[in-house]
A protein has these predicted regions:
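GHKL-family ATPase ATP-binding module
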Residues: 1-268
Length: 268
């Protein structure tokens, strides 16, 4: 409908009404408070300083969401029920000008914001977003993040002689991600996704931009915070030792199953 002139006012802003069409959205036309709260909480963390209020007039529930810490606060929130092995999350924020794959003479601004903190669990918790939209299946931003992490930690562990001489194994990406809670947010103009659901980012320019930003940030953190770096590296090495021990145990079991009853040379 056309706009109406309501006269002078000191109020500013935009009011949007969404009323679901029952002929399209049936049988679900009722709004779930918890679903809205979780999504608005995400947006609050992903957009630092934005003030969001949720008011449910059906029940009288009201909550105000305002996060000044960005994804750093998001990671702390996610780790509330977990025991972190280092106090402060690693926080990286940078805009990288990346050459366009389609037009090499043009640069694309890629805003990268990431926070990570390790805890004493054995599972990885990674949430990745592009322009505030979650990607359940990852994509080029997650690939860039993992590449940077692998390079940074392997170099730091090797250069600081943290591994013992008896440790005859390589550190893998899975070792580094054990117990990791991480939130990765990128903002990029005209992103491309693998499907209409936007579950996977495929914009090629994002991967090198994220790798560059995270590599620089991680290297700086590790050099400036040796105590926390040692705690994280010990966690990573512990995961690698456990993986190697499990591999050796499987080999012993396999030899016992398939090698039993055979002559010594054949059993070997």
């Amino acid at each position: 409908s056309p706009m109406k002139d309501l006269g002078p006012t000191d109020k500013r802003g935009t009011e949007v009404h969404f009323l679901p069409n029952k002929s399209i959205f049936m049988p679900i036309t009722d709004f779930n408070y918890d679903t809205l709260l979780n999504r608005l909480r995400e947006l609050s963390f992903l957009n630092s300083g934005v003030d969001i209020e949720l008011n449910d007039e059906r029940t009288g529930k009201h909550v105000r969401l305002e996060s000044e810490g960005g994804v750093r606060s998001f990671v702390l929130y996610k780790n509330t029920t977990r025991h972190a092995i280092h106090k402060d999350p690693i926080y990286i924020q940078k805009t990288v000008m990346q050459k366009s794959a389609k037009d090499p003479g043009k640069e694309i601004p890629v805003y990268v914001e990431v926070a990570m903190q390790w805890n004493d669990s054995y599972n990885e918790s990674l949430a990745a977003y592009t322009n505030n939209i979650a990607q359940r299946d990852g994509g080029t931003h997650v690939t860039g993040l993992r590449l940077a992490m692998t390079q940074a930690f392997k170099n730091y562990i090797a250069n600081n002689d943290i591994l013992k001489k008896a440790d005859k194994f390589d550190i893998t990406g899975e070792d580094m991600r054990e117990g990791l809670t991480c939130v990765l947010s990128v903002k990029v103009p005209q992103p491309s996704f693998s499907s209409q659901t936007k579950d996977k980012l495929v914009t090629s320019e994002v991967q090198p931009a994220v790798t560059a930003a995270v590599s620089e940030g991680l290297n700086t953190f590790l050099e400036e915070n040796p105590d926390q770096a040692k705690e994280i590296c010990n966690k990573i090495i512990g995961a690698a030792r456990a993986r190697e021990a499990a591999r050796k145990a499987r080999e012993v079991t396999r030899k016992q199953v398939f090698g039993g009853g055979l002559p010594g040379k054949l059993a070997d």
